[in-house]
Structure formats: structure tokens, C-alpha cells
Amino acid sequence: MLGANCLESGDGYLRATLGGAIEAKIDWPNSGTRCQGEPKDRPSGVRLSFQRVPGGSPDLLFVFGITGVHEGRPARAAGVNVTVIVQGTNRLYGTLGDSRCTVDSLAQRPLDAKGVYRVEARGFCTQPAHAVRGKDSVLVSTFEFAGRVAFDGESEDAKQPFRIISK
């Protein structure tokens, strides 16, 4: 079952503007949004995911893979691999690398648990995320978020992975 809040502090969020196969203005507040994050390899950085508690329309899952982010350090002009999944369908869009999207700025603030940070970032994409199946594409022209990244590998997030729902 998805948790009801992104950050315990109440200040998590996701905002994004989407065009193309999905036309949407996303404005997800902390309440009702689930977020999780962890370090990633190849290339090294962090991966953050955002999803609304079921019931939203469209039911989307966003994954941001940000290159070159290190524990506790700010980042600028970092490449981002963006994936958008429409839950309950076979629609999956990805930039297939970090050259189409950029994080302008990223800041980290330590939270109570060791190795866990509030990560706030804003950025944009200059090219669309293409459908894995089909010819559609989605342009995430702007995005900004505040979520949680656990660098320690022992977070609650690892115990409760996102459910990808497919029909």
C-alpha cells in the first residue's frame, strides 16, 4: 500500500509540464504523493521516483535518474534520464539517457536518519521522452520536485518498492 506523504516534514512535491502524448500540468503536493530515492550506478548519481496514491487521472509514475549527484552535495547542470509510466497501461516513455534533460539546480538537506536527505531540484527537457512501444512521445518541458534520497541502502523505501500496474 502506498504511503500518504512524500516527506514526513510535509514539504515534498512534484510539479511538471507535459506535452505530446500526455498533456498535463502536474502539481502534486506532499499529501497523497509517494516519493523515494536511492543512489544509482552507471552512470553514478541518484534516482528519485514520484507517484500519486491511486485515484489520480492519469495515473502516472515519474522516475528521474540524475547523473553526478553525490551524498550531501549540491549540483548544477546535471544530466537527467526521465521516465514517465502510465500505470494500468503499456504506455512507457523514456529519454533513454541523460542528454535530453537537465537539472538546473539541486540542493540537499540532511534528514533525521543517517544517510537520508531531502533533495530539491528543478530542471527542463529540450527533447521528448519516446514511447518504448509505438511512436508517441512526451515532452517534460519543466519539472521541479522535493523528495527523499536514502544513500545508506537500508531505507524503508527499499522494503516498499513502487507497484507498476499493467493491464
Name the predicted role of every residue range.
Residues 112-167:
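C-terminal or internal capping secondary-structure element at the end of a domain, subdomain, or sheet
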Residues 1-22, 158-167:
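N-terminal low-complexity, Pro/Thr/Ser-rich intrinsically disordered segments
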Residues 3-6, 35, 101, 125:
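Cysteine-centric signal of extracytoplasmic or virion-exposed proteins
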